[in-house]
Protein backbone atom coordinates (compact mmCIF):
# COMPACT_ATOMS: atom_id res chain seq x y z
CA UNK A 1 0.00 0.00 0.00
CA UNK A 2 2.76 2.44 1.00
CA UNK A 3 4.68 1.58 -2.17
CA UNK A 4 1.67 2.38 -4.35
CA UNK A 5 1.12 5.69 -2.55
CA UNK A 6 4.80 6.63 -2.91
CA UNK A 7 4.74 5.79 -6.62
CA UNK A 8 1.60 7.90 -7.07
CA UNK A 9 3.21 10.84 -5.27
CA UNK A 10 6.38 10.44 -7.36
CA UNK A 11 4.40 10.49 -10.61
CA UNK A 12 2.45 13.54 -9.43
CA UNK A 13 5.66 15.36 -8.45
CA UNK A 14 7.40 14.54 -11.74
CA UNK A 15 4.36 15.72 -13.68
CA UNK A 16 4.33 19.00 -11.77
CA UNK A 17 8.04 19.50 -12.46
CA UNK A 18 7.56 18.73 -16.14
CA UNK A 19 4.69 21.24 -16.42
CA UNK A 20 6.81 23.91 -14.70
CA UNK A 21 9.66 23.32 -17.18
CA UNK A 22 7.25 23.42 -20.10
CA UNK A 23 5.54 26.59 -18.85
CA UNK A 24 8.85 28.41 -18.41
CA UNK A 25 10.06 27.29 -21.86
CA UNK A 26 6.87 28.39 -23.63
CA UNK A 27 6.90 31.71 -21.78
CA UNK A 28 10.42 32.32 -23.07
CA UNK A 29 9.34 31.31 -26.58
CA UNK A 30 6.55 33.88 -26.44
CA UNK A 31 8.76 36.64 -25.04
CA UNK A 32 11.48 35.96 -27.62
CA UNK A 33 9.03 36.85 -30.39
CA UNK A 34 7.20 39.74 -28.71
CA UNK A 35 9.96 41.69 -26.92
CA UNK A 36 12.09 43.50 -29.56
CA UNK A 37 15.40 43.32 -27.67
CA UNK A 38 15.04 39.54 -27.20
CA UNK A 39 14.43 38.87 -30.89
CA UNK A 40 18.16 39.30 -31.55
CA UNK A 41 19.03 36.36 -29.26
CA UNK A 42 18.55 32.82 -30.64
CA UNK A 43 15.76 31.06 -28.77
CA UNK A 44 17.88 28.14 -27.53
CA UNK A 45 20.52 30.49 -26.11
CA UNK A 46 17.82 32.51 -24.36
CA UNK A 47 16.67 29.28 -22.71
CA UNK A 48 20.20 28.62 -21.42
CA UNK A 49 20.44 32.14 -19.99
CA UNK A 50 17.08 31.82 -18.20
CA UNK A 51 18.08 28.38 -16.93
CA UNK A 52 21.28 29.85 -15.50
CA UNK A 53 19.27 32.59 -13.82
CA UNK A 54 17.06 29.95 -12.19
CA UNK A 55 20.14 28.03 -11.04
CA UNK A 56 21.62 31.25 -9.61
CA UNK A 57 18.57 31.75 -7.36
CA UNK A 58 18.73 28.03 -6.46
CA UNK A 59 15.63 26.93 -8.40
CA UNK A 60 16.25 23.36 -9.51
CA UNK A 61 13.93 21.86 -12.08
CA UNK A 62 14.51 18.30 -13.35
CA UNK A 63 17.93 16.72 -12.85
CA UNK A 64 19.57 15.86 -16.16
CA UNK A 65 20.82 12.30 -16.42
CA UNK A 66 22.66 10.65 -19.31
CA UNK A 67 19.70 8.28 -19.77
CA UNK A 68 17.24 11.17 -20.00
CA UNK A 69 19.32 12.92 -22.66
CA UNK A 70 20.50 9.94 -24.70
CA UNK A 71 17.39 7.76 -24.56
CA UNK A 72 14.54 10.29 -24.38
CA UNK A 73 15.69 13.64 -25.78
CA UNK A 74 18.34 12.72 -28.34
CA UNK A 75 16.53 10.22 -30.66
CA UNK A 76 13.80 12.67 -31.78
CA UNK A 77 16.32 15.49 -32.29
CA UNK A 78 18.56 13.28 -34.41
CA UNK A 79 15.64 11.86 -36.37
CA UNK A 80 14.19 15.29 -37.18
CA UNK A 81 17.53 16.54 -38.48
CA UNK A 82 18.13 13.36 -40.50
CA UNK A 83 14.57 13.40 -41.89
CA UNK A 84 15.18 16.87 -43.33
CA UNK A 85 18.71 16.16 -44.60
CA UNK A 86 18.27 15.66 -48.34
CA UNK A 87 20.28 12.85 -49.87
CA UNK A 88 21.28 14.87 -52.93
CA UNK A 89 22.80 17.57 -50.71
CA UNK A 90 24.57 14.98 -48.57
CA UNK A 91 25.87 13.22 -51.67
CA UNK A 92 27.37 16.46 -52.96
CA UNK A 93 29.14 17.11 -49.64
CA UNK A 94 29.85 13.55 -48.45
CA UNK A 95 33.64 13.77 -48.51
CA UNK A 96 34.17 16.82 -46.26
CA UNK A 97 31.40 15.63 -43.93
CA UNK A 98 33.12 12.25 -43.62
CA UNK A 99 36.46 13.92 -42.91
CA UNK A 100 34.97 16.24 -40.26
CA UNK A 101 33.03 13.43 -38.54
CA UNK A 102 35.94 10.96 -38.40
CA UNK A 103 39.40 12.54 -38.60
CA UNK A 104 37.91 15.72 -37.13
CA UNK A 105 36.89 13.83 -34.00
CA UNK A 106 40.36 12.25 -33.70
CA UNK A 107 42.02 15.67 -34.03
CA UNK A 108 39.74 17.15 -31.37
CA UNK A 109 40.20 14.27 -28.92
CA UNK A 110 44.00 14.31 -29.18
CA UNK A 111 44.22 18.12 -29.37
CA UNK A 112 42.13 18.58 -26.22
CA UNK A 113 43.47 15.68 -24.14
CA UNK A 114 47.17 16.53 -24.27
CA UNK A 115 46.82 20.21 -23.16
CA UNK A 116 44.55 19.10 -20.29
CA UNK A 117 47.17 16.57 -19.25
CA UNK A 118 50.29 18.72 -19.83
CA UNK A 119 49.09 22.11 -18.54
CA UNK A 120 46.14 21.02 -16.41
CA UNK A 121 47.87 18.17 -14.62
CA UNK A 122 45.13 15.63 -15.40
CA UNK A 123 45.97 11.97 -15.83
CA UNK A 124 46.13 11.34 -19.59
CA UNK A 125 43.45 8.62 -19.59
CA UNK A 126 41.06 10.96 -17.74
CA UNK A 127 41.90 13.83 -20.08
CA UNK A 128 40.99 11.62 -23.04
CA UNK A 129 37.54 11.02 -21.54
CA UNK A 130 36.90 14.76 -21.19
CA UNK A 131 38.21 15.30 -24.72
CA UNK A 132 35.94 12.58 -26.15
CA UNK A 133 32.91 14.23 -24.56
CA UNK A 134 33.94 17.63 -25.93
CA UNK A 135 34.44 16.32 -29.46
CA UNK A 136 30.66 16.00 -29.97
CA UNK A 137 29.27 19.13 -31.67
CA UNK A 138 25.70 20.35 -31.23
CA UNK A 139 25.09 23.45 -33.39
CA UNK A 140 21.27 23.54 -33.00
CA UNK A 141 21.08 27.31 -32.45
CA UNK A 142 23.57 28.01 -35.27
CA UNK A 143 21.60 25.90 -37.77
CA UNK A 144 18.40 27.69 -36.75
CA UNK A 145 20.24 30.96 -37.36
CA UNK A 146 21.37 29.73 -40.80
CA UNK A 147 17.77 29.06 -41.78
CA UNK A 148 16.53 32.37 -40.40
CA UNK A 149 19.20 34.44 -42.16
CA UNK A 150 19.17 32.45 -45.40
CA UNK A 151 22.66 30.94 -45.32
CA UNK A 152 23.47 28.66 -48.24
CA UNK A 153 22.15 25.11 -48.43
CA UNK A 154 25.74 23.89 -48.63
CA UNK A 155 26.65 25.54 -45.33
CA UNK A 156 23.53 24.05 -43.71
CA UNK A 157 24.34 20.58 -45.04
CA UNK A 158 28.00 20.71 -43.98
CA UNK A 159 27.20 21.87 -40.46
CA UNK A 160 24.22 19.57 -39.87
CA UNK A 161 25.67 16.55 -41.67
CA UNK A 162 28.89 16.76 -39.69
CA UNK A 163 27.01 17.14 -36.41
CA UNK A 164 24.77 14.12 -37.01
CA UNK A 165 27.58 11.68 -37.74
CA UNK A 166 30.07 13.39 -35.42
CA UNK A 167 27.82 12.72 -32.41
CA UNK A 168 27.71 9.01 -33.16
CA UNK A 169 31.47 8.76 -33.65
CA UNK A 170 32.22 10.80 -30.49
CA UNK A 171 29.97 8.60 -28.34
CA UNK A 172 31.60 5.44 -29.72
CA UNK A 173 35.10 6.84 -29.05
CA UNK A 174 34.09 7.64 -25.46
CA UNK A 175 32.69 4.13 -24.88
CA UNK A 176 35.93 2.63 -26.18
CA UNK A 177 38.11 4.87 -23.97
CA UNK A 178 36.08 4.72 -20.74
CA UNK A 179 37.40 1.27 -19.78
CA UNK A 180 41.05 2.40 -19.74
CA UNK A 181 41.03 4.46 -16.49
CA UNK A 182 38.86 1.78 -14.88
CA UNK A 183 41.48 -0.84 -15.71
CA UNK A 184 38.95 -3.03 -17.53
CA UNK A 185 40.60 -2.58 -20.93
CA UNK A 186 43.83 -1.46 -22.55
CA UNK A 187 44.43 0.47 -25.73
CA UNK A 188 45.25 -1.70 -28.73
CA UNK A 189 44.97 0.03 -32.10
CA UNK A 190 43.82 -2.99 -34.12
CA UNK A 191 41.28 -4.08 -31.48
CA UNK A 192 40.03 -0.52 -31.07
CA UNK A 193 39.54 -0.05 -34.82
CA UNK A 194 37.75 -3.40 -35.09
CA UNK A 195 35.41 -2.48 -32.24
CA UNK A 196 34.81 0.96 -33.71
CA UNK A 197 33.84 -0.47 -37.11
CA UNK A 198 31.62 -3.10 -35.46
CA UNK A 199 29.72 -0.60 -33.31
CA UNK A 200 29.18 1.78 -36.24
CA UNK A 201 28.25 -1.11 -38.55
CA UNK A 202 25.60 -2.47 -36.19
CA UNK A 203 24.08 1.01 -35.90
CA UNK A 204 23.99 1.45 -39.67
CA UNK A 205 22.51 -2.03 -40.14
CA UNK A 206 19.72 -1.47 -37.62
CA UNK A 207 18.85 1.88 -39.18
CA UNK A 208 18.74 0.40 -42.69
CA UNK A 209 16.59 -2.59 -41.70
CA UNK A 210 14.02 -0.53 -39.80
CA UNK A 211 14.01 2.29 -42.36
CA UNK A 212 13.49 0.14 -45.45
CA UNK A 213 11.03 -2.16 -43.67
CA UNK A 214 8.81 0.76 -42.69
CA UNK A 215 9.18 2.30 -46.15
CA UNK A 216 7.84 -0.88 -47.76
CA UNK A 217 5.12 -1.19 -45.11
CA UNK A 218 3.73 2.32 -45.64
CA UNK A 219 3.35 1.61 -49.37
CA UNK A 220 0.46 -0.70 -48.49
CA UNK A 221 -1.83 1.84 -46.83
CA UNK A 222 -2.58 5.55 -46.60
CA UNK A 223 -3.16 6.39 -42.94
CA UNK A 224 -1.38 9.69 -42.12
CA UNK A 225 -1.54 9.45 -38.34
CA UNK A 226 -0.44 5.80 -38.31
CA UNK A 227 2.50 6.66 -40.58
CA UNK A 228 3.36 9.61 -38.35
CA UNK A 229 3.31 7.34 -35.29
CA UNK A 230 5.50 4.79 -37.06
CA UNK A 231 8.20 7.41 -37.63
CA UNK A 232 8.20 8.13 -33.89
CA UNK A 233 8.45 4.42 -33.09
CA UNK A 234 11.26 4.03 -35.63
CA UNK A 235 13.35 6.77 -34.00
CA UNK A 236 13.28 5.17 -30.55
CA UNK A 237 13.20 1.62 -31.95
CA UNK A 238 16.40 2.11 -33.98
CA UNK A 239 18.17 3.55 -30.94
CA UNK A 240 17.09 0.78 -28.55
CA UNK A 241 17.73 -2.05 -31.02
CA UNK A 242 21.20 -0.82 -31.96
CA UNK A 243 22.20 -0.29 -28.32
CA UNK A 244 20.93 -3.72 -27.27
CA UNK A 245 22.90 -5.36 -30.09
CA UNK A 246 26.09 -3.58 -29.01
CA UNK A 247 25.99 -0.92 -31.71
CA UNK A 248 25.63 2.85 -31.86
CA UNK A 249 22.07 3.98 -31.20
CA UNK A 250 22.94 7.47 -32.40
CA UNK A 251 24.07 6.18 -35.81
CA UNK A 252 20.99 3.93 -35.97
CA UNK A 253 18.63 6.88 -35.50
CA UNK A 254 20.49 9.01 -38.06
CA UNK A 255 20.35 6.26 -40.69
CA UNK A 256 16.67 5.42 -40.16
CA UNK A 257 15.80 9.13 -40.30
CA UNK A 258 17.65 9.57 -43.59
CA UNK A 259 16.09 6.44 -45.13
CA UNK A 260 12.55 7.43 -44.18
CA UNK A 261 13.07 11.09 -45.07
CA UNK A 262 14.59 10.45 -48.49
CA UNK A 263 13.08 7.09 -49.51
CA UNK A 264 10.12 6.09 -47.34
CA UNK A 265 8.44 9.48 -47.51
CA UNK A 266 8.80 9.43 -51.30
CA UNK A 267 7.43 5.97 -52.10
CA UNK A 268 5.10 5.34 -49.16
CA UNK A 269 3.57 8.72 -48.29
CA UNK A 270 1.45 11.08 -50.33
CA UNK A 271 2.27 14.81 -50.21
CA UNK A 272 -0.36 15.49 -47.53
CA UNK A 273 1.06 12.78 -45.27
CA UNK A 274 4.61 14.02 -45.81
CA UNK A 275 3.51 17.49 -44.78
CA UNK A 276 1.76 16.16 -41.66
CA UNK A 277 4.82 14.13 -40.65
CA UNK A 278 7.23 17.01 -41.31
CA UNK A 279 5.14 19.44 -39.24
CA UNK A 280 4.91 16.85 -36.46
CA UNK A 281 8.69 16.44 -36.30
CA UNK A 282 9.24 20.19 -36.44
CA UNK A 283 7.01 20.45 -33.37
CA UNK A 284 8.79 17.58 -31.59
CA UNK A 285 12.21 19.16 -32.20
CA UNK A 286 10.98 22.53 -30.89
CA UNK A 287 9.39 20.83 -27.87
CA UNK A 288 12.50 18.81 -26.93
CA UNK A 289 14.93 21.68 -27.54
CA UNK A 290 12.77 23.95 -25.39
CA UNK A 291 13.15 21.55 -22.49
CA UNK A 292 16.74 20.45 -22.87
CA UNK A 293 18.37 23.88 -23.28
CA UNK A 294 16.49 25.26 -20.28
CA UNK A 295 17.65 22.28 -18.22
CA UNK A 296 21.25 22.70 -19.42
CA UNK A 297 21.27 26.24 -18.06
CA UNK A 298 19.59 25.12 -14.85
CA UNK A 299 22.19 22.38 -14.23
CA UNK A 300 25.19 24.72 -14.42
CA UNK A 301 26.60 25.25 -10.94
CA UNK A 302 28.78 28.36 -11.09
CA UNK A 303 30.40 27.65 -7.72
CA UNK A 304 31.42 24.16 -8.85
CA UNK A 305 32.77 25.52 -12.13
CA UNK A 306 34.98 27.98 -10.27
CA UNK A 307 36.73 25.07 -8.53
CA UNK A 308 38.06 23.88 -11.90
CA UNK A 309 38.37 27.23 -13.65
CA UNK A 310 41.95 26.61 -14.82
CA UNK A 311 40.99 23.30 -16.46
CA UNK A 312 37.95 24.92 -18.08
CA UNK A 313 40.05 27.75 -19.56
CA UNK A 314 42.59 25.25 -20.92
CA UNK A 315 39.78 23.18 -22.41
CA UNK A 316 38.13 26.22 -24.02
CA UNK A 317 41.39 27.26 -25.66
CA UNK A 318 42.04 23.69 -26.81
CA UNK A 319 38.51 23.32 -28.23
CA UNK A 320 38.76 26.55 -30.22
CA UNK A 321 42.26 25.78 -31.55
CA UNK A 322 41.60 22.12 -32.41
CA UNK A 323 38.34 23.06 -34.13
CA UNK A 324 40.29 25.61 -36.18
CA UNK A 325 42.95 23.05 -37.13
CA UNK A 326 40.31 20.44 -37.89
CA UNK A 327 38.08 22.61 -40.09
CA UNK A 328 40.76 24.50 -42.00
CA UNK A 329 43.13 21.53 -42.31
CA UNK A 330 40.51 19.01 -43.43
CA UNK A 331 38.85 21.56 -45.72
CA UNK A 332 42.22 22.01 -47.43
CA UNK A 333 42.41 18.26 -48.02
CA UNK A 334 38.80 18.15 -49.20
CA UNK A 335 39.31 21.02 -51.63
CA UNK A 336 42.46 19.39 -53.03
CA UNK A 337 40.59 16.24 -54.03
CA UNK A 338 37.17 17.79 -54.69
CA UNK A 339 37.56 17.58 -58.46
CA UNK A 340 38.09 13.81 -58.31
CA UNK A 341 35.56 12.57 -55.75
CA UNK A 342 33.42 15.48 -54.58
CA UNK A 343 31.86 18.53 -56.17
CA UNK A 344 32.16 20.62 -53.00
CA UNK A 345 34.70 23.42 -52.62
CA UNK A 346 34.60 25.03 -49.18
CA UNK A 347 35.55 28.71 -49.26
CA UNK A 348 37.56 30.41 -46.52
CA UNK A 349 34.44 32.30 -45.42
CA UNK A 350 32.51 29.06 -45.07
CA UNK A 351 35.41 27.43 -43.21
CA UNK A 352 35.42 30.33 -40.75
CA UNK A 353 31.72 29.87 -40.00
CA UNK A 354 32.11 26.10 -39.65
CA UNK A 355 34.97 26.70 -37.20
CA UNK A 356 33.22 29.30 -35.07
CA UNK A 357 29.81 27.59 -35.25
CA UNK A 358 31.02 24.26 -33.84
CA UNK A 359 29.14 24.58 -30.56
CA UNK A 360 28.93 21.95 -27.83
CA UNK A 361 25.66 21.02 -26.17
CA UNK A 362 23.42 18.22 -24.95
CA UNK A 363 25.41 15.28 -26.35
CA UNK A 364 28.65 16.44 -24.70
CA UNK A 365 26.80 16.87 -21.40
CA UNK A 366 25.17 13.43 -21.66
CA UNK A 367 28.54 11.80 -22.31
CA UNK A 368 30.14 13.63 -19.37
CA UNK A 369 27.32 12.65 -17.01
CA UNK A 370 27.75 9.00 -18.02
CA UNK A 371 31.31 8.87 -16.64
CA UNK A 372 31.25 6.08 -14.01
CA UNK A 373 31.15 7.07 -10.33
CA UNK A 374 34.23 4.89 -9.77
CA UNK A 375 36.38 7.47 -11.57
CA UNK A 376 37.54 9.96 -8.93
CA UNK A 377 37.86 12.83 -11.39
CA UNK A 378 34.24 12.46 -12.59
CA UNK A 379 33.14 15.85 -11.21
CA UNK A 380 36.13 17.58 -12.82
CA UNK A 381 35.18 16.12 -16.21
CA UNK A 382 31.56 17.25 -15.76
CA UNK A 383 32.65 20.77 -14.76
CA UNK A 384 35.03 21.03 -17.73
CA UNK A 385 32.31 19.98 -20.16
CA UNK A 386 29.68 22.29 -18.65
CA UNK A 387 32.15 25.19 -18.72
CA UNK A 388 33.02 24.65 -22.38
CA UNK A 389 29.35 24.19 -23.33
CA UNK A 390 28.52 27.44 -21.57
CA UNK A 391 31.29 29.29 -23.43
CA UNK A 392 30.40 27.94 -26.87
CA UNK A 393 26.68 28.59 -26.44
CA UNK A 394 26.91 32.10 -25.02
CA UNK A 395 30.05 33.46 -26.71
CA UNK A 396 30.21 31.65 -30.04
CA UNK A 397 26.46 31.17 -30.33
CA UNK A 398 25.67 34.85 -29.77
CA UNK A 399 28.38 36.09 -32.15
CA UNK A 400 27.87 33.69 -35.09
CA UNK A 401 25.28 36.03 -36.57
CA UNK A 402 27.86 38.82 -36.76
CA UNK A 403 30.40 36.43 -38.29
CA UNK A 404 27.89 35.49 -41.00
CA UNK A 405 27.15 39.13 -41.75
CA UNK A 406 30.80 40.17 -41.62
CA UNK A 407 31.74 37.46 -44.12
CA UNK A 408 28.80 38.35 -46.37
CA UNK A 409 27.26 34.88 -46.11
CA UNK A 410 23.72 36.09 -45.51
CA UNK A 411 21.54 34.71 -48.29
CA UNK A 412 18.40 35.93 -50.05
CA UNK A 413 16.02 34.32 -47.57
CA UNK A 414 13.76 37.42 -47.18
CA UNK A 415 13.27 37.57 -50.95
CA UNK A 416 12.61 33.82 -51.10
CA UNK A 417 9.99 34.12 -48.38
CA UNK A 418 8.33 37.03 -50.15
CA UNK A 419 8.39 35.07 -53.41
CA UNK A 420 6.86 31.98 -51.77
CA UNK A 421 4.11 34.09 -50.17
CA UNK A 422 3.28 35.81 -53.45
CA UNK A 423 3.15 32.51 -55.35
CA UNK A 424 0.90 31.00 -52.67
CA UNK A 425 -1.35 34.05 -52.81
CA UNK A 426 -1.50 33.82 -56.61
CA UNK A 427 -2.52 30.15 -56.51
CA UNK A 428 -5.18 30.81 -53.87
CA UNK A 429 -6.68 33.76 -55.77
CA UNK A 430 -6.79 31.76 -59.00
CA UNK A 431 -8.72 29.01 -57.26
CA UNK A 432 -11.12 31.52 -55.71
CA UNK A 433 -11.68 33.13 -59.11
CA UNK A 434 -12.30 29.73 -60.72
CA UNK A 435 -14.96 28.97 -58.12
CA UNK A 436 -16.61 32.38 -58.51
CA UNK A 437 -16.90 31.83 -62.26
CA UNK A 438 -19.14 28.81 -61.60
CA UNK A 439 -22.18 31.06 -61.35
CA UNK A 440 -24.62 28.15 -61.27
CA UNK A 441 -23.26 27.17 -57.85
CA UNK A 442 -24.35 30.52 -56.35
CA UNK A 443 -28.03 30.78 -57.44
CA UNK A 444 -29.04 32.65 -54.29
CA UNK A 445 -26.40 35.39 -54.69
CA UNK A 446 -27.23 38.65 -56.42
CA UNK A 447 -25.47 38.68 -59.87
CA UNK A 448 -24.18 42.21 -59.24
CA UNK A 449 -22.56 41.18 -55.98
CA UNK A 450 -21.06 38.10 -57.65
CA UNK A 451 -19.64 40.24 -60.46
CA UNK A 452 -18.25 42.71 -57.92
CA UNK A 453 -16.45 39.87 -56.08
CA UNK A 454 -15.06 38.53 -59.35
CA UNK A 455 -13.67 41.94 -60.29
CA UNK A 456 -12.24 42.42 -56.78
CA UNK A 457 -10.44 39.07 -56.84
CA UNK A 458 -9.29 39.68 -60.42
CA UNK A 459 -7.77 43.00 -59.34
CA UNK A 460 -5.99 41.39 -56.38
CA UNK A 461 -4.69 38.62 -58.65
CA UNK A 462 -3.33 41.14 -61.13
CA UNK A 463 -1.62 43.07 -58.33
CA UNK A 464 0.07 39.90 -57.02
CA UNK A 465 1.14 38.91 -60.54
CA UNK A 466 2.69 42.35 -61.12
CA UNK A 467 4.61 42.12 -57.82
CA UNK A 468 5.91 38.69 -58.81
CA UNK A 469 7.18 40.01 -62.13
CA UNK A 470 8.97 42.91 -60.45
CA UNK A 471 10.53 40.60 -57.85
CA UNK A 472 11.80 38.21 -60.53
CA UNK A 473 13.25 41.11 -62.51
CA UNK A 474 15.08 42.39 -59.43
CA UNK A 475 16.21 38.92 -58.24
CA UNK A 476 16.58 36.64 -61.30
CA UNK A 477 17.95 33.78 -59.17
CA UNK A 478 14.45 33.31 -57.77
CA UNK A 479 13.52 31.74 -61.09
CA UNK A 480 15.98 28.97 -60.30
CA UNK A 481 14.17 28.42 -57.00
CA UNK A 482 10.90 28.14 -58.90
CA UNK A 483 12.42 25.64 -61.33
CA UNK A 484 13.68 23.46 -58.48
CA UNK A 485 10.28 23.52 -56.79
CA UNK A 486 8.69 22.53 -60.10
CA UNK A 487 11.16 19.64 -60.53
CA UNK A 488 10.40 18.46 -57.00
CA UNK A 489 6.65 18.65 -57.64
CA UNK A 490 7.00 16.53 -60.79
CA UNK A 491 9.05 13.98 -58.86
CA UNK A 492 6.46 13.89 -56.06
CA UNK A 493 3.63 13.26 -58.54
CA UNK A 494 5.61 10.44 -60.13
CA UNK A 495 6.39 8.85 -56.77
CA UNK A 496 2.79 9.16 -55.55
CA UNK A 497 1.50 7.49 -58.72
CA UNK A 498 3.87 4.54 -58.31
CA UNK A 499 2.95 4.23 -54.63
CA UNK A 500 -0.78 4.13 -55.54
CA UNK A 501 -0.09 1.37 -58.08
CA UNK A 502 1.82 -0.61 -55.45
CA UNK A 503 -1.05 -0.24 -52.96
CA UNK A 504 -3.46 -1.48 -55.67
CA UNK A 505 -1.23 -4.50 -56.24
CA UNK A 506 -0.48 -3.56 -59.84
CA UNK A 507 3.21 -2.87 -59.24
CA UNK A 508 5.53 -4.70 -56.90
CA UNK A 509 9.06 -3.79 -57.91
CA UNK A 510 11.31 -1.22 -56.27
CA UNK A 511 10.62 2.19 -57.79
CA UNK A 512 13.72 3.95 -56.44
CA UNK A 513 15.77 3.57 -59.69
CA UNK A 514 12.94 5.22 -61.62
CA UNK A 515 12.85 8.15 -59.19
CA UNK A 516 16.61 8.63 -59.27
CA UNK A 517 16.57 8.61 -63.08
CA UNK A 518 13.75 11.12 -63.19
CA UNK A 519 15.51 13.33 -60.66
CA UNK A 520 18.69 13.20 -62.71
CA UNK A 521 16.81 14.20 -65.85
CA UNK A 522 15.26 17.14 -64.05
CA UNK A 523 18.62 18.34 -62.82
CA UNK A 524 20.03 18.14 -66.32
CA UNK A 525 17.18 20.06 -67.92
CA UNK A 526 17.89 23.64 -68.95
CA UNK A 527 16.49 26.30 -66.69
Curated annotation (Swiss-Prot):
One record GO biological process: regulation of intracellular pH
Protein's UniProt name: Low-affinity Na(+)/H(+) antiporter NhaS1
Membrane topology per record: Multi-pass membrane protein
Gene Ontology MF terms: potassium:proton antiporter activity; sodium:proton antiporter activity
A Gene Ontology term for the protein's cellular component: plasma membrane
Nucleus among keywords: no
Family the UniProt entry places it in: Belongs to the monovalent cation:proton antiporter 1 (CPA1) transporter (TC 2.A.36) family.
Annotated organism of origin: Synechocystis sp. (strain ATCC 27184 / PCC 6803 / Kazusa)
Major location (coarse): membrane
Function description: Na(+)/H(+) antiporter that extrudes sodium in exchange for external protons. Might be able to function at relatively high concentrations of Na(+) ions. Also has Li(+)/H(+) antiport activity under K(+)-rich conditions, but it might not have any physiological relevance.
InterPro entries recorded: Cation/H_exchanger_CPA1 (IPR018422), Cation/H_exchanger_CPA1_bac (IPR004705), Cation/H_exchanger_TM (IPR006153)
Keyword vocabulary terms for this entry: Antiport, Cell membrane, Ion transport, Membrane, Sodium, Sodium transport, Transmembrane, Transmembrane helix, Transport
Transmembrane regions: 18-38, 41-61, 94-114, 126-146, 169-189, 196-216, 240-260, 276-296, 311-331, 352-372, 380-400
Localization terms from the record: Cell membrane
Amino acid sequence: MDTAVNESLSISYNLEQFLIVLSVSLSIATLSKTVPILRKIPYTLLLVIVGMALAFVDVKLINLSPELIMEIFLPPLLFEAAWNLQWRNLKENWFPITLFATLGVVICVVGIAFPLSYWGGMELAIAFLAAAALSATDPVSVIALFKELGASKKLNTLMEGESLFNDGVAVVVFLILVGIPLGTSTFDLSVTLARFVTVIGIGVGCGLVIGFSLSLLTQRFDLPFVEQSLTLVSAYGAYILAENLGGSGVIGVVVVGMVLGNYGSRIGMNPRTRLIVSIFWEFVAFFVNSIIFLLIGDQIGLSSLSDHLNLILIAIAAVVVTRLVSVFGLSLISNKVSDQISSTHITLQEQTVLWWGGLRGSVAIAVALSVPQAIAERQAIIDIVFGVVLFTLLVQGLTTQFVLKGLDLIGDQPQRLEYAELVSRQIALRRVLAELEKTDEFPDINPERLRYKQELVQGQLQSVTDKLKLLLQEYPLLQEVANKKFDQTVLDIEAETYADLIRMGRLEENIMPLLVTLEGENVAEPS
